[in-house]
Amino acid sequence: LSSEKKNIIKKFSKKYNLPISIIAPYKKKHPMVSKFSLFSKKLATKNNTVNLLLNSGPLREHIADLSLQDNFPLIASSANLSQRGTKYRVKDIETRVKRCADIIINYGPCEIYKEGKTFDHNGLSLSSTQIDFRDMSIVRKGVYFKEIYNIFKDEFDINLALRL
């Protein structure tokens, strides 16, 4: 990504505590990427991009910091079956998914769940808003979509294109 786009990501993530997924190209020779097995790399990348979740809460941020400090890559799942909606509490995770886990940390419901922001007007479970930084397009509308869209428009003068 250009330095301008990197600065937008840094400024957004520091100034606003809104969960957002950034889709961006990755450096194939990056030390973290080079540690992936072929299987892991296939799971963690798509079309030469990675999807990084930012502002995902204190526990996940701390684990990510430890990962960076130790130069040990982590790949995380959404803890749900495909097309079954994001789970915000351990008790809502499907049993089939729980059986696959080596460890489950019940850190309690996240803030957006407590705020009642996890469902859209149709009652469907929302996840993070995904933005593809290659072309500044919305790949998925998620929690706080309107706020995120307006921040990019007002603060960064970027009209995010809807690719849905």
Model-derived regions, located:
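Active-site-adjacent structural elements in enzyme catalytic cores
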Residues: 1-164
